[in-house]
């Protein structure tokens, strides 16, 4: 009658602080109407865990399976779950409605104990649903909704963006551009802000024409990239928010006879296999994607087995890996 999952009912009975007051009232009203009484003895004797964690991916299937970040994070989650004798299952779809239906089906049937969301986006209806239903979830990425009640694992992407830009500055670059993912993704917005912070610190004016954003890092982004390279005063270095996008940049540079790193230095993020497979190999910020997954799984299982733990946030450190795509300004 309350239209919520069995785990939400269980957590309401235990007065879990992660369940909203509105949801608690809805569940308790339905319990009264049904004449339901909690059997605390049975609850203590019998585990209600399914020992399964749902992993929620973004709606774009192509981008997910081409992006090493998601694959490494899933590898970390699976590795830790196996150690703790939990299972994990992937939830995705062609669009948000399809993902929501899958989440509803899994949670109401008691097939999962909680969800790890592998991305963080502003005004996300999936997060709205998870929170309103009192479902246990953890974000990989910074929480922008229900921040005080949300568990999340993240990098300090502001600092990472600043560090990448500072590295180029120390090589003598002053005409530094930014090429990134859509800023509705919180990691991309923070990396861009970090880039701007580094410019401001050194008194370098921010040039809007030196910034380009793309909706799909694995799509055809030739136009956006060319707009940066064909400026009246072209940049001597570019901070790129993702290794995959940096590979596209290298390809367009090759087509336009722009030499890397002699004409253009490139620094990117994720330190994926792609960064090591290009020529020249990419200097990249390692965000420790697998460790993000491990930490998310660890926190999830801790909160499943100890429901009254308060929401926490964990920051996983990043590391700059120097390779061949950057040099001192000529």
Name the predicted role of every residue range:
Residues 1-51, 327-330:
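N-terminal helix-turn-helix DNA-binding module of bacterial transcription factors
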Residues 100, 123-127, 246-249:
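Short, well-ordered alpha-helical microsegments
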Residues 102-114, 192, 196:
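Short, electropositive alpha-helical surface patch
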Residues 5, 51, 113, 174-175, ...:
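Short acidic/polar active-site loop segments enriched in Thr and Asp
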Residues 36, 94-97, 118-123, 244:
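Short beta->alpha connector loops
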Residues 33, 76-85, 131-139, 144-330:
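Bacterial carbohydrate/catabolite-sensing allosteric modules
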Residues 36-101:
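Amphipathic helical "hinge" segments at domain boundaries
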């Amino acid at each position: 009658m309350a239209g919520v999952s069995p785990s939400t009912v269980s957590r309401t009975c235990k007065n879990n602080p992660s369940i909203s007051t509105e949801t608690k009232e809805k569940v308790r009203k339905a319990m009264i109407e049904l004449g339901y009484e909690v059997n605390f003895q049975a609850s203590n004797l019998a585990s209600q865990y399914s020992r399964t964690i749902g992993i929620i991916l973004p709606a774009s299937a192509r981008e997910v399976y081409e992006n090493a970040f998601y694959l490494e994070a899933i590898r970390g989650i699976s590795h830790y779950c196996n150690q703790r004798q939990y299972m994990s299952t992937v939830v995705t779809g062609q669009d948000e409605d399809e993902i929501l239906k899958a989440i509803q089906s899994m949670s109401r049937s008691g097939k999962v104990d909680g969800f790890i969301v592998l991305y963080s986006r502003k005004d996300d209806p999936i997060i709205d649903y998870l929170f309103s239903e009192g479902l246990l979830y953890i974000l990989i990425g910074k929480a922008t909704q229900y921040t005080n009640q949300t568990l999340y694992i993240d990098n300090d992407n502001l600092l990472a963006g600043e560090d990448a830009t500072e590295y180029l500055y120390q090589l003598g670059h002053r005409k530094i551009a930014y090429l990134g993912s859509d800023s509705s993704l919180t990691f991309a917005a923070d990396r861009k802000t970090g880039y701007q912070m580094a410019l401001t610190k050194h008194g370098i004016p921010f040039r809007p024409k030196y910034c380009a954003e793309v909706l799909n890092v694995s799509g055809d982004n030739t136009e956006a990239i060319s707009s940066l390279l064909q400026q009246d005063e072209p940049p001597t270095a570019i901070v790129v928010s993702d290794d995959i996008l940096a590979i596209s940049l290298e390809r367009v540079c090759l087509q336009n006879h722009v030499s890397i790193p002699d004409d253009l230095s490139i620094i990117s993020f994720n330190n994926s296999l792609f960064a090591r497979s290009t020529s020249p190999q990419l200097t990249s910020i390692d965000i420790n994607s697998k460790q993000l997954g491990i930490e998310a799984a660890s926190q999830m299982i801790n909160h499943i087995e100890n429901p009254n733990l308060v929401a926490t946030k964990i920051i996983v450190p990043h590391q700059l890996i120097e390779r061949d795509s950057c040099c001192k300004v000529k």
